[in-house]
């Protein structure tokens, strides 16, 4: 099993056993660690994508691909467990990818990438090409979304797909709102039952599970 860790953004791991490979996202790339079996000592296998600020890593279990979202670097793909990478972001017109997710539609795999400024992109060919889903930008209340640090732009920090229905996705905007789509990302609505009207500035959503 491969496990992923990052200082920012979202991680999706592959498998349910104790990991023997660990991908650790950093401000200067991804560090690889391996061990022969659970409980054994970890061995440093070096760093890949050196110089890239990696904020999010995902292992897609059906085909085993790994996707990494970069701050100011777009999206990268690995097909060999994280040792070599290629850029896969054609169609992603926003360079900062904060979150990545997948949905299984039978044998098909839909991939999602959340960005800054806050938007959502979808791929139906395993990351080779992407199409922006305009619904996030059309969400009511978007004008209140912001972020404390310059350039004060909100981002899609986290997302999760309903295991019962791959068209149902929840996304958290930092700082903004909790969003839901029931059509695979085309249209989104705000979920605000959990908060009070005066609390909108505190909707600093880091994780949706």
Please identify what each model-predicted range represents.
Residues 1-209:
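Extracellular glycan-interacting surfaces
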